[in-house]
Amino acid sequence: AQAYADSIPILVLPGGVLLNQIAVKPNFSAVHNYQGIVKQVEAVYQPEDIGNAMRRAFHALRNGPGGPVVVELTADVCMKEIPDNALNYQSPPRALAQPSDSDISDAVKALRAAKRPLLWAGQGVLLGGATAELKQLAELTGIPVFCTMPGKSAMDERHPLCLGAGSGLTTMAAGKWLSECDLILALGSSLTRTFYGQPIRSNNKVLIQNTDDISAISRDESVDIALLGDTRLTLLALIDAIKDETGGSGFGDIKSTAKIIAEVKADWLKQWQPLLTSTEEPLNTYRVIHEIDKNLDHENSIVTHDAGAPRDSFVPFYTATSPHSYVGWGKTTHLGFGIPLMIGAKMANPEKFCLNLMGDAAFGMSGTDLETASRSGFAITTVLLNNGNMATYPRGFPEAGKFGVGEMQGDYAKIAEGMGAVGLTVTKASAMAPALQQARELNQSGQTVLIDVHSNMEAKKSRY
């Protein structure tokens, strides 16, 4: 379900029951039950089907919008030999498309006519390998860039034209441009409305949408110009068209725009400085995030949030720099997903320092996966905000307090040690940076680490 919500291509091969038991209750059928949460699902009913089924599966994984693909392996069929004449699998190619020249021309015309345009960078920029082209378009036009939660790290947030990223909450600079812009060029984004993303804040904006999913165009928003196709090819076409029209010089006042962004960012950080540098005990959540942001080697780290309050607090304030250095997720908001996600990140990037920030409630959902990380040798660091409560409940569920819903306790450092990891406990703000340094060193030696941070229930959110 998480892969479906976040449009992530994964292959799932569940075992199925015997053919003559498919219709017998309570046997489970992937074909019948997964329809609403996958991109494609089928079952193998005879050995001769395997090559064709796998070709269709990998075609779906490599082309069009992302999503999970399921091939159910029926039990008795999988015990049979595949006939020699059925060994016919051929790896399907990736087929790329790009918008028509007329659509590109219309988009460039609209961009040049806009007084306050905005580039909206979605996950498709990352998955399409288009981060360099996004930066080039921004610098060619002087248009600032906002990154969605799944698109966070598509643009280096230190870049003077980057406004930052947003989940349901965002930076002040992003909030300003999202409210005041008269045109949005959405790149690699479905623009689907969600509690975990920023809305299109008025109907008076020109909306240009690029996506490789035709069903996403005008799904939730009225789109003026549709750029259907691969995001990188779309960006290259836009860049070429702008260069042709301007003699290579581009348009837009980069210095003036960058100056405004810098001023708004400085004002925003000044407002938040008391919390980001707070010395209170238990530790303020934003001080924890600030220490992570200050002390990590961003280009050699991969970080992620967890569902709920950690996501809301982390996304605006962590500075993503290089592509895929931040993994933004959570449209179905599964508590605890951060730990297995970072194990996967470590498997794919063993040289990187992989860290997830989570609450104590989320740890209750997947904390035993620290044993997996420890046993497998894929050493990660988990920073756990130990505040004894599920931070969402006090605001949205006033009756929960009567029954203790969301309340919890535990020595999580000790629990981690019981599963083969190293447990560190932080009770003072001054100890946070040394703990992160120690965690990096322990990870390098192959040891998984949990940092149990005694933190507060900070309620303030970056809502602009």
Language-model features: locations:
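N-terminal alpha/beta PP-like core and its mobile active-site loop of ThDP/TPP-dependent enzymes
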Residues: 1-248, 252, 372, 379-382, ...
